[in-house]
Amino acid sequence: MAVIRDVMPAFELVQPSSIADAQKVLEEQRENGWVLAGGMDSFDWLKDRIKKPKVVVDLSGVAELKGIRTTTDGIEIGAMTTLTEVVQHSVIREKYKLLAESAELVASPQIRNQGTLGGNVSQDARCWYYRAGWPCYRAGGNICYADTPEGRNREHAILYADRCVAVNPSDTAPALIALDAKFVMRTSKGERPVDAEDYFIGPEIDITRLHILNPGDLLTAIRIPSTWAGAKFYFEKVRDRNVWDFALLNVASAMVVTSGSIERIRIAVNGAAARPLRLKVVEDAIRGKPPNRATGEMAGKLAVEGAIPLQFNGYKIPLMRNLVKRAIGGVEEA
């Protein structure tokens, strides 16, 4: 299939200065509108001419969407705050370093300087068939090219695949789920906060999107409660190269240990399914147990129950098992 690359289609550029103005344009344009944050995902789509919006709404001039603010119950991060700003913020590094660690492993320094937190959690699937313009399920077709005997599916899903086997590529998403963050959206009905884990969706809900934003909606901020401030955190990202690459799998956990036992825990993985997965079964099973190797072993086995590998990604099952094991029992050799 021939694709014209590096030649953007014509579009109208709108540069609002307020959230209200931005949302007004997005509501008017609906499916014809496109949100431009840092541009790390957007420009790939536009240059390859796979996405052809009529109106691009550039949010770089909306000051309300930028910055990190402490609140009475935690911290609020504007959706247009860059990943570098997240990594370097003193309060995040002190109290919520799980997010700083995950953001610091995104791509390269140059991309983190430009890319935003809102963009990282809202980026689209990286499946090469979908990205190359093939008429797959996610693009409105009637086949998943990756889920065929000869399909290139080494990086794809092992859990909860439903027609499409592409995975969510965000590094910060599992960290925000583990921190019990709220994603704040502005819709036609006003402000709508949702739990981080509910912001992401799989193909069983809508095969064309990885998140719940409808045309006309806008992600404005991410709020992290103080509930998990200073907890024991663990983040690990496995990728083919130690620079630049998207994750094959990643894991994030937040844990409070009292008298040698796990009192509270939240753990999430990404790269295993179309959405980041909070492992509630694992959380329930290990609560009250010591955070040691044996508990980690049990957690890892529970995490991969029901996993079904594709032709070329069977390695993800032991990888996910060991990542979860290390997130619970520390960094002992798996």
Where are the predicted features?
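C-terminal structural segment of proteins
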Residues: 1-334
